Amino acid sequence: VRLVRDFPENALRVTAGDIFYASDGFQSTRSAAGITLARNFALQPYRSVRPAGDTQFDIERTSRVEVFVNGQRVQTLRLAPGRYNIRNFPFASGPNDVAIRITDEVGRTETIRFPFIFDATLLGAGEQEFSHAIGVPSESTPTGRDYDTGGYVFSGFHNIGITDALTAGANVQLSDEQRQFGANVRFATRIGTFRTDIAVSHADTASTDFAVRTQYRYTDDLASSAGRTLSASAIYRGRDFATIETTAEPSNPVALDLAVSYGQRLFWDTSGSIGYGRQFGRGDTPDLDTYSLTLIQQITSEISLSFVESHRAGAEGNDDTRFFAGVSYAPFGSPHRFAASLDTGTRSSRINWSYAPSYTLGDVQADATLERTPADYTLSGSARYTHYRFEGTVQHDENLPRDGDLERIALTSLRFGTALAFADGHVAASRPINDSSVLIAPHPRLRDYRINVNPREDEEADARTDWLGPAVLPSLTSYYVHQVVLDAPDLPIGFELGDQIYGVEPTYRSGTVIRAGTGGTVLLDGYLLDAAGKPLGLHVGTFTAVDEPDRPPIKFFTNRAGRFRVLGLSPGRYELWVEVFSDRFYRFELPEDAAGLYNIGRIEFPTE
């Protein structure tokens, strides 16, 4: 159980209760109950916090703006006059040269170039990322959770973007049994990105020790046809180095771990990578060398092959070579996918079929797998159905021993999930809600008519009203802007749905209500005349509901013949006002059975 309070304007989240906290460097996590304060960039999803150079440009007139990264156009926008920053545009990791081509409404073109380095692991200059948590240790038990009120846990880190190419930070973790202090630095160059972490620890069961990790990564720019990637790492852990999870004597059987990997696109839609690793053991742990080779061949847009060879060479001659080969077939435009693989390391083979429609609502997702090992055959399969109001899953797993003397094991499980959504006095049944939700509540006069939410061309929708009441959109990501479209295909003439397009920006695990329909059920048709019986042509006026004083006035206008048609009225008393005669009105009443197109005939307005 936990409470969450967000401060979106500062991208801060405070959590109290059973907490989950972020970690950095050599930090680890330990279950705890307490409070956390963290910078959460997900609270400002449209704000870029990664480096993009000190690059602003001005637009004097409404213009078409094309963004080029390393000569390749990645985005085209139409922007209004103002000052803009390329922090708001997408860029791939690696060394990038960016050009902004601005074309105004009369065809004049200006190109502005911004050569700079960008890497998604860095913070922009002046940006800060942090997480601080304090509490008491806890652990899960068969009866719930057990809290160690005699102990404590503190975990925190803080990273700062010093420049767009340099980020540095520090971190600390403390408990009643262990202390750890660390620091890191990350910097980007045209030959790649580097990161180094260092940490010092002291545990009650061990002496003071340290750990160091250095990483390197290079990724080709977007314009490269080779798509090269290169990564390397070196990690050293001292014999007595301990993390916050360490409650006994530390165990670090590997002193130094080295790894390097290189990959690129080759030929004929083939890509490959090679890797090498070396572990230097400590004490009785032998040294270990590992080699790997991976090839992926995209034969067609539907068929791909993969091959992996790995070799492990131990110091005592315990060599091991493994091969993995796989093929997958995904027919174009089909939700079906077929795959088969062979693994010599586990001496197993498997075949798999899956069915995953692009739109799952109102459809079934299914998969089935048959695996063969030296000991048995394993058959597993599942099917999941998603309805507007619930989800249901059936899962079957069966183990068939190849040795007839062993017991056959079969397990079938059924799961059903639904939810009740509460918002602003409205209640509705929904399929399980993952984050935020929007509840669409129809006006009482529209309850007998179906309202589709975000309708599609195949007459399906993301949600709809029915005999169970309001519709619910259950899976909206917090702090993003979502468009909600309403459609009522069976609504009779005269019944008013009101606004049909809404924009919502929900907060964390919140519920939003959209009220569909104004209550209007009458399309009023008639003629407006003056006291002498002549048409009041080309006049503007309003209808005001006497019985509903909070209801906004309904504006109308007449044609040259004085005729008007007004949507949004309902049974009850009204006052008709004409703008040029602001000191007088005409009162009338629509009967209780008035619905649809209602002809009120000729209205003689008291113009004298």
Task: Enumerate the predicted regions with their spans.
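Short acidic/polar hinge/loop motifs at secondary-structure boundaries
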Residues: 79-91, 96, 471
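Core alpha-helical transmembrane segments of integral membrane proteins
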Residues: 132, 136-139, 144, 154-172, ...
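Surface-exposed loops/turns
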Residues: 93, 478, 560, 570-571
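Flexible, glycine-rich linker and terminal segments associated
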Residues: 1-64, 69-79, 103, 108-137, ...
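Short, flexible loop/turn segments at beta-strand junctions in immunoglobulin-like
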Residues: 88-91, 473-477, 566-568
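C-terminal structured "cap/appendage" subdomains that terminate the fold
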Residues: 551-556, 560-569
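A short tyrosine-centered beta-strand micro-motif
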Residues: 84, 96-98, 482, 574-576
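Outer-membrane beta-barrel translocator/receptor signature
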Residues: 148-156, 164-166, 178-181, 347-352, ...
